[in-house]
Amino acid sequence: MKKCVYTDELLQAKVRIVSTRWQVEACTAQARNPAGITAGQNVLSLESFAAQIHPAETVDRATALWFLRDLLRTIPVGRYQRIAKEVGFPAVLFGWISTLIGEKIEPDALAGPQKDLRALYAAYLSRLKERGLRSREMAIAAAAEKAAKETVGTINVSGFIDFRAVEMDFLDALAEKNEITVVLQKYGANAFVKAREAAF
């Protein structure tokens, strides 16, 4: 890693990465941030930035929900069978599966009550692979493999306290060739220590 600085100020950077799209919109909407640096085209969500490093066809939410509804028709889900036909169940599954992928948890690692969903999770991953699609988290993981070789310049990262394992791996790989400033935005001393231990 070249350099990692922790600060509560937004410094001038070639790219500013934030954790979500709504944060990008919020940054772009305000003409200037408190530090007086213009927020503009260089503000990207981590997902968008990863797509620039390694373009990948990601599955949209509607398609993912359709896949899950279809799989629920044929794959038994044990103790969850009673609620499997509920309208909101595929959306809950989508969020849960996204979290599992983001934390790099494989279907075989599921235990306890979650093991009833092991076959469904594995089938969902297979369906994505068959269609040549990736989840947002898979796309970020693929970008991480390439990121260690990419030189971008100075990068500000904020909102990363919410990042999951796959996103942290991406930032870690990116730090191999780039200077990264982690912007904590006055989270306090405890967050600073936690962030430093978790990230780098």
How does the language model describe each region?
Residues 15-16, 126-128, 153-156:
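N-terminal start-of-chain detector that recognizes signal peptides
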Residues 166-200:
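Conserved RecA-like helicase ATPase core segment
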Residues 151-163:
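Conserved P-loop NTPase "ATPase switch" module shared by AAA+ and STAND
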Residues 4-5, 10, 21-151, 165, ...:
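Basic/charged alpha-beta structural segments of nucleotide/phosphate-handling enzymes
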Residues 16-18, 156, 179-185:
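Structural recognition of the conserved hydrophobic beta-strand(s) that form the central parallel beta-sheet
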Residues 15-24, 161:
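Acidic, metal-coordinating catalytic cores used for nucleic-acid/nucleotide bond scission
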Residues 1, 11-13, 150-154, 177-179:
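A general structural motif
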